[in-house]
Amino acid sequence: MICLLPLIAVMLFVFATHTVLALEIATGIDAPETEFSASTQTTRVSFRRITSVDNKRFLRQETTFEEKPSVNDVHAEERSSFYRKFLYRLFGDRMDVEAKVLARDSNWLINIFRRKFLRWAGREEHPHKATTFDTTCCQVAPYDPVTSS
């Protein structure tokens, strides 16, 4: 009986598929037979007179080059701010992440995310700091016992 369960399941699936396809064919309407009425083919276009106020507003926007964010931009900015703060809380500062990636005992799976974070942090500014720091001047040479004594 247990051996027949997969066979019964496949048969039910095939039966259901054929039933659905038969219903689609029976109720389907071919596109060439359908004719649209004249009222659905025409579209309405409303025209608005352009006034001098509109022209002044357009010129003012052209000269000031102000780009005000739309609603979608505001939501995108809020989301990116949330993710930015989340990543900095999760991984810490950029130099901490670089040290953890270079460490030999670090987890390889987490290092993948740390490397992605490093690429992202190289483009973005820290959300809580006013200035960004250049890490190229702070590179530390590896310890060499021969030259250090």
From Swiss-Prot:
Family label: Belongs to the RxLR effector family.
Role description: Secreted effector that completely suppresses the host cell death induced by cell death-inducing proteins.
This protein's name: Secreted RxLR effector protein 47
A GO cellular component annotation in the UniProt record: extracellular region
Keywords: Host membrane, Membrane, Secreted, Signal, Virulence
Keyword Protein transport: no
Motif RxLR-dEER per UniProt: ranges: 57-79
Domain characteristics, as noted in the entry: The RxLR-dEER motif acts to carry the protein into the host cell cytoplasm through binding to cell surface phosphatidylinositol-3-phosphate.
Region forming the signal peptide: 1-22
Keyword Secreted assigned: yes
Locations listed in the record: Secreted; Host membrane
